[in-house]
Amino acid sequence: MSGDSLRVAMLSVHTSPLEQPGTGDAGGMNVYITELSRALARSGAEVEIFTRRTSSAQPDVVEVGDGILVRHITAGPFEGLDKNDLPGQLCYFSAGVLRTEAARTQGWYDVVHSHYWLSGQAGMLAADRWNVPLVHSMHTMALVKNGSLAPGDVPEPAGRVIGEEQVVEVADALVANTAAEAEDLVTHYAADPTRVHVVSPGVDLETFTPLPPAGADGARDTAAAERAALGLPADRKVVVFAGRVQLLKAPDVLVRALGVMADHGDELPLLVVLGGASGRPTALRELEALAYQVGVSDDVLFLPAVSRSELARWFRCADLVAVPSRSESFGLVAVEAQACGTPVVAADVGGLRTAVQDGRSGVLVPDHDPHRWAAVLRDLLRDDERLARLSRGALEVAAHFSWDTTAEETRKVYEQARVA
């Protein structure tokens, strides 16, 4: 594994990088795997992403770019399986991964990089069989999530906790998005600190770009045209939430905050919810019902998840992007919003403390009390000068994140795991 020669087996059992983020189980991890793979390929690596087939129409292999293949592995029925059902399909999935390597020259892959604990379980077997290092990214951790559950949310099962502990014990290297995540690995899972490496995710600065700065020729017309194209009012503040509609992501906090603002007679922004139900099929309907219950149905626009380029357009046209998650290992959407020059209001949890610089690129809210969120939104949306200052800071913060840097640092982790 010297020079540019590197072959990576990337494992993502429960969600494919080809799926639309913001729907089902697809989210920031999908973007992470896709963008990391692209950056690794630009550095000369070959990446093969193994994921579970969820449709008979999916071909065995999809080439998604130079040096990047997605391999669909049949493991269980294509439809009807919840993520919690997938541990029972890991044997079939692992067998499919091993068969792929068995058809090639021995020693084809240099490293296994697994994502999420399900993939880590399969990765342990593959890395052992191929005698290559296992590098693992948790993305989320059951013990962390269970420590910050929303009322009514279901805790992660003990089987997941045990599975995560096994992966942490066996992995040659663990990649954490932030120092806080690294600390969680050591504190909650007794990870060996010498095997934990902090590598920040990046952001696609070619897709997520700002509008022309205020005062530039045609800037006002461009902004108005962008809003008009999305059907947004030109003279109303807009707050965007982009993500899966589930209790963990806490869009209900925003809806309740709008209800509080309405009760106080405040001028309400338009809240745009971009995303579909995840976990519970009724999650979106329940959020719509909540908006009706608190009297803000006409002030919340529910739309399905959109492509990356369309998401950038929504971010550019928003006055604020809100990320009220109860637990977040990083919060990629927050950095993408800032790359568009849009300040972020986020919960003061986990990786969001790294993704958002409080007072410089956005505001971190210390809890999930709708009254506190209402106060923060009210104060920000009334202060155009402050929004403009935070917008400038958002661009500065986002400029420090790069997928090429992420790939470079990840390759170093691969190298260290190989020689350990």
UniProtKB/Swiss-Prot annotation:
An individual GO BP term: mycothiol biosynthetic process
Instruction: Kindly report, in one word, the top-level EC class recorded for this enzyme.
Output: transferase
Entries under InterPro entries matching the protein:
Glyco_trans_1, Glyco_trans_4-like_N, Glycosyltransferase_grp1, Mycothiol_biosynthesis_MshA
Could you list this entry's UniProt keywords, alphabetically sorted.
Glycosyltransferase, Magnesium, Metal-binding, Transferase
Which annotated residues bind Mg(2+)?
Answer: 315-316, 318, 342
Q: What is its EC number?
A: 2.4.1.250
Its UniProt entry gives the catalysed reaction(s) as:
1D-myo-inositol 3-phosphate + UDP-N-acetyl-alpha-D-glucosamine = 1D-myo-inositol 2-acetamido-2-deoxy-alpha-D-glucopyranoside 3-phosphate + UDP + H(+)
Superkingdom of the source?
Bacteria
- Does the record's keyword annotation contain Hydrolase? no
Binding residues annotated for 1D-myo-inositol 3-phosphate, in chain numbering: 14, 25-30, 83, 116, 140, 160
Pfam families on file:
Glyco_trans_4_4, Glycos_transf_1
Please tell me where UDP-N-acetyl-alpha-D-glucosamine binds in this chain. Answer: 20-21, 28, 244, 249, 306, 328, 336
Molecular function terms in GO for this entry?
Answer: acetylglucosaminyltransferase activity; D-inositol-3-phosphate glycosyltransferase activity; magnesium ion binding
Functional description taken from the UniProt entry: Catalyzes the transfer of a N-acetyl-glucosamine moiety to 1D-myo-inositol 3-phosphate to produce 1D-myo-inositol 2-acetamido-2-deoxy-glucopyranoside 3-phosphate in the mycothiol biosynthesis pathway.
Q: Which HAMAP family match?
A: MshA (MF_01695)
Q: Which NCBIfam families match?
A: mycothiol_MshA
Question: Its family?
Answer: Belongs to the glycosyltransferase group 1 family. MshA subfamily.
The record's subunit annotation is: Homodimer.
This protein is called D-inositol 3-phosphate glycosyltransferase
Naturally occurring in which organism (per UniProt) = Sanguibacter keddieii (strain ATCC 51767 / DSM 10542 / NCFB 3025 / ST-74)
Q: What taxonomic classification does the UniProt entry list for its organism?
A: Bacteria, Bacillati, Actinomycetota, Actinomycetes, Micrococcales
